[in-house]
């Protein structure tokens, strides 16, 4: 059986478990990147899905995850805590951009690459899912190059992983 579609769930720190499971499955030939046609993801899964779209080298990903000086990126200042009520989150889209910048540069992609441009380069449909909190009812929004072709990859990932109070919502 050939796996053509990956579905990556959210779950915050569970994203590390998901990463390990995907790596194990790939290394044991349960799936091959060459056969992947689409990635459907939410929250932490969208971050991992973004990594997989930009590099398919597990050693590069391992080195990045383990050796990046995360303390320099994740700096929670007293100002961020005090502005939490107004901004509704400690981190914003700039953090997501900083996380993905090395991979975008290594692929020679613009850091503002759109979902349509990414599809044209990878030929993989990338779907991020988010919830619209501004509607009368909570509605799930599917984000892909089919529905939002001009949306930047980092913005789509940020929208999907906008955990309340951690990341500022994107309207």
Cite the ranges covered by each PLM segment.
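Patatin-like phospholipase
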Residues: 1-42, 50-171
């Amino acid at each position: 059986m050939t796996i053509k579609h990956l579905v990556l769930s959210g779950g915050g720190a569970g994203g590390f478990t998901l990463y390990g499971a995907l790596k194990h499955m790939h290394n044991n030939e349960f799936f091959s990147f060459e056969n992947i046609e689409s990635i459907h993801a939410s929250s932490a899964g969208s971050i991992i899905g973004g990594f997989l779209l930009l590099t398919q080298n597990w050693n590069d990903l391992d080195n990045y995850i383990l050796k990046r000086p995360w303390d320099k990126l994740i700096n929670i200042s007293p100002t961020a805590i005090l502005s939490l009520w107004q901004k509704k989150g400690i981190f914003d889209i700039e953090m997501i951009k900083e996380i993905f910048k090395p991979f975008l540069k290594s692929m020679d992609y613009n850091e503002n690459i759109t979902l349509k441009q990414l599809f044209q380069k990878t030929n993989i449909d990338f779907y991020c899912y988010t919830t619209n909190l501004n509607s009368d009812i909570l509605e799930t929004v599917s984000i892909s190059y089919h529905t939002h072709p001009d949306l930047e990859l980092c913005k789509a990932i940020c929208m999907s992983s906008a955990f309340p109070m951690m990341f500022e919502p994107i309207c």
